[in-house]
Amino acid sequence: MKGRDRKVIVRGDAGRIVCERCELADGPVSRARGLLGRSGLAPGEGLLLRPAFSVHTFFMRFAIDIVFLDRSGEVVAVAEAVRPWRAATRFRARAVLELAAGEAARLKLRPGERLEPEAVAG
């Protein structure tokens, strides 16, 4: 099962929940579709794209926080409140977590923290 059919919870240091309702986009179609067509993300919602080192907000209707992760899940960069019609790239990244704008600051996500996705049954 791939794409939006798969749900994950993303945990940070000390097991704290960073994204409670996160969709996994790990196929070419689900990664290309991303958050297109949505009106927004609520706190606790997100999209984990992998593999990915670059994302764009073209055709989107809302700003997002973008968390870039390396191969081991360590945060390498955070781009906050990226508005529509922008692009963000971090060549060291191997995955990207998209969150509602303001969530990265609220959660105090910083480079060096390790994030770990866990599969959710059902």
Enumerate the language-model features and the residues they cover.
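Compact, glycine-rich, soluble single-domain proteins
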Residues: 1-122
